[in-house]
Amino acid sequence: MAGLDLPFTAVNIDADESYPAYLQAGDIPYYISRAKANAYAPNLTPGQLLITADTIVWLDGQMLGKPHDETEAAAMLRALSGKTHQVYTAVTFASITNEQSSMTNNQQSVSLETIVDCTDVTFAELTDDEIDYYISKYRPFDKAGAYGVQEWIGYIACTEMKGSYFNVMGFPVQKVYKMLKKYKKSA
């Protein structure tokens, strides 16, 4: 958001990030992003716009989330090595609507709108030394798929990308900006 020259306040949201096992690919971050928005929704006030996001890496029908330790991070990077995977990011926009209902005892309701973006990323073959170096230096335990495209691994491993670079970073800013213009018009 700072790169868009827009004022914002970051908030920590304590949300359950588990999801139903039947969800696949882009449905997973969609579900989690909305769960984050719903967790914070009681704190929203009229005129506020909450933006939540979630990103996953999808490889061969499997979701790669954030690794818990070095062993799991190395296994993820070995799996990505020499292959094409998808990065899905869902972004949810939450705001108070003006509609009131007798069913909600005249409480204001929250409107949620979610977009999902997908980028195909191809990795070069990685050596064990490269994987070990990256994990020890960059500690990618807070990153889906155990990598940050903006870090060293992105420079040496990402050989091809179809879609938004910013989506791979975890926030598809072009699509978010387009949505923000829509919200500005309706305000």
Task: Locate the predicted segments by residue.
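Short loop/helix-cap segments at secondary-structure boundaries that form the rim of catalytic
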Residues: 1-4, 20, 43-44
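N-terminal G-site helix/loop of the GST-like fold
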Residues: 1-11, 183-186
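Anionic-ligand binding patches
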Residues: 24-187
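A short small-residue
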Residues: 12-20, 154-157
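Short, conserved active-site loops that position catalytic residues or coordinate cofactors/metal ions
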Residues: 10-15, 52-55
